[in-house]
Amino acid sequence: MLALGKLLELTLTDHEPAEKTQVTPKGARLRWLGEGALEVRPAESDDCGLDLLLSAGIHGNETAPIELLERLLHGVANGKIRPRARVLFLFGNPAAIRKGERFIEQDINRLFNGRHELSSGFEALRAAELEQFARVFFSKPGRNRLHYDLHTAIRGSKIEQFALYPYKEGRKHSRRELARLAAAGMEAVLLQSKSSITFSAFTYEQLEAEAFTLELGKARPFGQNEQVNLDKLEERLIRIIEATEPEDESSLDGLQLFSVSREIIKHSDSFHLHLPADIENFSELSKGYLLAEDLAEMRWVVEEEGARIIFPNPKVKNGLRAGILIVPDSGQRLG
C-alpha cells in the first residue's frame, strides 16, 4: 500500500508525509496537497474529463463517510480501482475528526460562501482553506465537475439516506444527476430554493459543479458503522471514478422529491421548538400544528399539506436555521 493511500491515518496522527507524490500500479498519480487533502490524477490516456470532489468529516464525529472515502482511496492506491476521473479527497475538519467531535469551536458547514470572512477561529480558517482547495481543483476549463459532501445525521430519520441539492438562480436541477443519486441508493432529494452557506452550496453556486450534501444515516464512532449500509453508494462511486456508469441512465423510480417550504430561524434565546427532542428527520406534521415560538409573539404554524420537518435543532446560535419545513415536489422544473 502506498503511504499516501493512508490519508485517514495521516490525518488522525497529524502527520505530514515525507513523500508528497506517488504513482499507483495503474499509473495514477497521488499528490498530497495539505492536511486531509489528496488529489488523484489518472494516467493521461485514461482521463475521462470528470473532476470529482469527495469530502467527508466536515463534522468530525460523522465517521461512516470518512471510512468510505478511506476504502475508496485504498482501492486506488493498491491498484484495485483504476481511476479515469480526477478525484480530490478532502477530510473537512481534521482537528474535530481527531477528537471525535462535531466541531471544535463552531459548525464549519455554516461558514462557506464567504461566511468565514465574518467569523474567526480555527473552523473559519479551515473553511477558507477548503474553498481554496475546491477552487483550484475545479479551475480547469472544459471539464465536468461533481461534488459529493458526505455526512451522517445527529438524529434518526424516517428516510435514512437522502441528498440536498443546492440552488442557484437561473440554473435548473438536473434529472441526470438525480438518476445517478437514485442508483447510488438515495431514497429522497431535497431541492433547495435559496442560496446557502454549506460546502456543497459553495461549489454549486461559485464553481459551477453539480454538488450535493448526502446524508447517509446516524452518526456513530469509528468502527461502529455496521448499521450504515453504504454498499450502493460505494459501488456507484467506484463506477464514477472508473467511468463505467451506464450512459442512458434516467430512471427516478423510488426517489422521493421534496422542496423547501419554509426555514425556521431562531431569532433569540426565547426561541422554543415544539417538537420532541428525539423526533426523526422527515417526520410528518399536521396542518395547524404550532411548530415554534420566539420573541414578539412570533409563531410558526404549519399551513402546508404533507409537511415534514428536517434538521430540527433549537440549540443553534441566534440568527441560524433551527429547522426546515419541507413538502413533496412533483419534479416538473427539472432540467
From Swiss-Prot:
Pathway participation: Amino-acid degradation; L-arginine degradation via AST pathway; L-glutamate and succinate from L-arginine: step 5/5
Q: How is the cofactor bound?
A: Binds 1 zinc ion per subunit.
GO terms under biological process: arginine catabolic process to glutamate; arginine catabolic process to succinate
Specify the species: Pseudomonas putida (strain ATCC 47054 / DSM 6125 / CFBP 8728 / NCIMB 11950 / KT2440)
Reported function = Transforms N(2)-succinylglutamate into succinate and glutamate.
Matches recorded under PANTHER family:
ASPARTOACYLASE, SUCCINYLGLUTAMATE DESUCCINYLASE
Q: Which reaction does it catalyse?
A: N-succinyl-L-glutamate + H2O = L-glutamate + succinate
Cofactors needed by this protein, per the record, are: Zn(2+)
Give the record's family classification: Belongs to the AspA/AstE family. Succinylglutamate desuccinylase subfamily.
Keyword tags: Arginine metabolism, Hydrolase, Metal-binding, Zinc
What's one Pfam family here? AstE_AspA_hybrid
What SUPFAM superfamilies does the record tag this protein with? Zn-dependent exopeptidases (SSF53187)
Q: Which residues form the active site?
A: E215
Residues noted as binding Zn(2+) in the record, renumbered to the chain: H59, E62, H151
State what protein this is by name. Succinylglutamate desuccinylase
The organism that produces this protein has a lineage beginning with: Bacteria, Pseudomonadati, Pseudomonadota, Gammaproteobacteria, Pseudomonadales
Q: What is its EC number?
A: 3.5.1.96
A molecular function annotated in GO for this UniProt entry is:
zinc ion binding
